[in-house]
């Protein structure tokens, strides 16, 4: 929006041309989203408290979680508001990738909002039934996948790229739609499963988004892409603004979500942010790198799959409780220790993901 204004004002003063730079708009995107989160956060928390929109706590979970009962939830709406406003202000709104990622984020956020609303407002412990949740995730995920497939401008945009192997790429054809669907829906649910402790999901999400911003910048620049032997995706660089907005909004939310949390993001935030990461990774053809950098999300998801499969097949549980962060809590780890150690793991995995840019 403001980019269009700056382009118009260039005829009066050439200094407005500075807003053409992605890096500047990315910085402004971070600061705008951060400021909005910090400004609106206290108001949102008070509003949620007044309306008694509080978190329900499982009785069979760690006893330390009983004190969290009633903590305001659905705070993810704050994150999505900050992301949307910042992106609309600073991004090039003629870029199709910006609209795809923003639409996926808000639509998955809507699914989470309905789920949270039914749990908290209507006091329905089941929330949105799983079959309907996955149905709408599938509808929106497939819609995004088909759109990206139909609008691909070169074969590389639908090719699977394997990091570390510079001469290996796998043309997917229509299989691109299937892969994209699983990446978007899988990422969405993985982040949601991770969101069980104060700040556990949001900081890894911020770190992965920051790393994806680097991939967006490099993939959107033909010279850098050729030098680093990564796919050149025209227009992908504009997603820096979205990634930056996510980083700013996430850090602002963490201010209130850090232990002991004043607010939880709820499904409205977790489902949306996971879907956003998956969509961005697909656009810049870095699905495998997302799997690496989001290793904490993968670990949480696998722990649930293993736990359910083991119990159904053998009647025994592998972990004391799943997702795995609860397993460590029940082993006696204090909540802050679990959180910080998972953050440290994410830092390491993100650095490994970034290292794949040169290790080819």
From Swiss-Prot:
Gene Ontology molecular function terms on file: metal ion binding; phospho-N-acetylmuramoyl-pentapeptide-transferase activity; UDP-N-acetylmuramoyl-L-alanyl-D-glutamyl-meso-2,6-diaminopimelyl-D-alanyl-D-alanine:undecaprenyl-phosphate transferase activity
Membrane spanning stretches: 25-45, 73-93, 97-117, 132-152, 168-188, 199-219, 236-256, 263-283, 288-308, 338-358
Catalytic reaction(s) noted: UDP-N-acetyl-alpha-D-muramoyl-L-alanyl-gamma-D-glutamyl-meso-2,6-diaminopimeloyl-D-alanyl-D-alanine + di-trans,octa-cis-undecaprenyl phosphate = di-trans,octa-cis-undecaprenyl diphospho-N-acetyl-alpha-D-muramoyl-L-alanyl-D-glutamyl-meso-2,6-diaminopimeloyl-D-alanyl-D-alanine + UMP
The entry's keywords: Cell cycle, Cell division, Cell inner membrane, Cell membrane, Cell shape, Cell wall biogenesis/degradation, Magnesium, Membrane, Metal-binding, Peptidoglycan synthesis, Transferase, Transmembrane, Transmembrane helix
Pfam families in alphabetical order: Glycos_transf_4
Enzyme class per UniProt: transferase
GO cellular component: plasma membrane
Pathway(s) this gene product operates in, as recorded in its UniProt entry: Cell wall biogenesis; peptidoglycan biosynthesis
Superkingdom of the organism of origin: Bacteria
GO biological process: cell division; cell wall organization; peptidoglycan biosynthetic process; regulation of cell shape
InterPro entries: Glycosyl_transferase_4, PNAcMuramoyl-5peptid_Trfase, PNAcMuramoyl-5peptid_Trfase_CS
Cofactor(s) the protein requires to work: Mg(2+)
Chief localization: membrane
Enzyme Commission code: 2.7.8.13
Location in the cell: Cell inner membrane
PANTHER family: PHOSPHO-N-ACETYLMURAMOYL-PENTAPEPTIDE-TRANSFERASE, PHOSPHO-N-ACETYLMURAMOYL-PENTAPEPTIDE-TRANSFERASE HOMOLOG
Protein function: Catalyzes the initial step of the lipid cycle reactions in the biosynthesis of the cell wall peptidoglycan: transfers peptidoglycan precursor phospho-MurNAc-pentapeptide from UDP-MurNAc-pentapeptide onto the lipid carrier undecaprenyl phosphate, yielding undecaprenyl-pyrophosphoryl-MurNAc-pentapeptide, known as lipid I.
Family note: Belongs to the glycosyltransferase 4 family. MraY subfamily.
Record's protein name: Phospho-N-acetylmuramoyl-pentapeptide-transferase
Designated gene of the protein: mraY
